[in-house]
Amino acid sequence: MAWQVSLPELEDRLQCPICLEVFKEPLMLQCGHSYCKGCLVSLSCHLDAELRCPVCRQAVDGSSSLPNVSLARVIEALRLPGDPEPKVCVHHRNPLSLFCEKDQELICGLCGLLGSHQHHPVTPVSTVYSRMKEELAALISELKQEQKKVDELIAKLVNNRTRIVNESDVFSWVIRREFQELHHLVDEEKARCLEGIGGHTRGLVASLDMQLEQAQGTRERLAQAECVLEQFGNEDHHKFIRKFHSMASRAEMPQARPLEGAFSPISFKPGLHQADIKLTVWKRLFRKVLPAPEPLKLDPATAHPLLELSKGNTVVQCGLLAQRRASQPERFDYSTCVLASRGFSCGRHYWEVVVGSKSDWRLGVIKGTASRKGKLNRSPEHGVWLIGLKEGRVYEAFACPRVPLPVAGHPHRIGLYLHYEQGELTFFDADRPDDLRPLYTFQADFQGKLYPILDTCWHERGSNSLPMVLPPPSGPGPLSPEQPTKL
């Protein structure tokens, strides 16, 4: 036979009508309804009139009510092992079956009917329990959501910490490597300086040793002559007089006398003043710590029709006649410019350009998106950063406004150092590799790819036809290129 009633529903049917809890020591009245023994006794004590069944309102005799043994056995069978006994009211000794919503406390049925909680809104404990369980579940869910957020935050913090530690380890390794390289370079310069001083010293000492050896030889010869003359002085009078002139002439031989004024003090002049050691070494190291020169070539597709490229697209000069070249967006059609075939969008880069004895030239970098049609707008606002020479005497930086540059002499080789992330483009007088002299520095927020640009300027009827050259990275000293040939 299958059961049609669930356990929770069965428990509801086994509840006392007074305390609304599962029967405890159930008693059956004459009308057939059952109540907890404690509930029935408490109800009888508080009534002055005859006892009536709370369910059917039939008059009954509470003192003659018999235990409902069958119901008690069913309840005993349904009760799980280890279930705690229900708490009871301290006033009526009845189970705490109700919850006073006003006072927020557990009460028994009599407290709600006759006690201090009379007329207060009350709710069965099971209902309150279910409601509070739902509230607890909602609170737990909310806490889980907060815990999830905290877990995500912890994961982000751990990842951030791990990343910081890793980046710190990498940067520390880079610092150690860079300082090791600097120590190596300093040791090289130290050895170079000491070797130079040692060589200079050895030359001076060798010269002095030679003079000292000659002087000592002269001294020995003079001592020998002195000894001979002293012995000659012991001769008898006649012999002394006869030989005196010959002996005196021998003592006066030029090779036996040191030359007057033959000694001239030699000064130690190594070509390096003590106070300038750090500055001189720094100038040498500065070039070594710059990036290796870039092996650049020129891009024929960008060259103005008057420009002639040669030597593997490393030499450019402005010719007298325009060449037939396809008109394309990347080609300059007015300004005599040409770009390098490779641009830079990050990192540190160094390259050099030989300008020789040209009277007019410009060079620098240009944004890849800058217009190449019409006259070139030479200003940082238009994505062009240049310096140049005009009429063989005026050096200027094409900033806003233009900045005259106090350049000493006429450098034949210009070095360019680009630090993309730092937003710096610095130009150097690179005629002396060990003594790069800064000419000007642009500060900018670079965006997009930058290309090295060379502007030969107009040929001026041949007076400014000398070429500009991208020298090979290992090229020693200023380059004097041959005359380029037309493409």
Curated annotation (Swiss-Prot):
User: Keyword annotations for this protein?
Assistant: Acetylation, Coiled coil, Cytoplasm, Metal-binding, Transferase, Ubl conjugation, Ubl conjugation pathway, Zinc, Zinc-finger
EC annotation from Swiss-Prot or TrEMBL: 2.3.2.27
Q: Note down the stretches annotated as region Disordered.
A: 468-487
Which Pfam families does the annotation name? PRY (PF13765), SPRY (PF00622), zf-B_box (PF00643), zf-RING_UBOX (PF13445)
- Post-translational modification N6-acetyllysine, affected residues: 373
The record's subcellular locations are:
Cytoplasm
| GO BP annotations, alphabetical order | innate immune response
Summarize the PTM comment. Answer: Auto-ubiquitinated. Acetylated by EP300 and KAT2B. HDAC6 drives TRIM50 deacetylation. Acetylation antagonizes with TRIM50 ubiquitination.
Give the UniProt family note: Belongs to the TRIM/RBCC family.
What is the protein's quaternary organization? Can form dimers and trimers. Interacts with several E2 ubiquitin-conjugating enzymes, including UBE2L6, UBE2E1, UBE2E3. No interaction with UBE2H. Interacts with BECN1. Interacts with SQSTM1. Interacts with NLRP3.
Q: What is this protein called?
A: E3 ubiquitin-protein ligase TRIM50
Q: What is the lineage of its organism?
A: Eukaryota, Metazoa, Chordata, Craniata, Vertebrata
Q: Which gene encodes it?
A: TRIM50
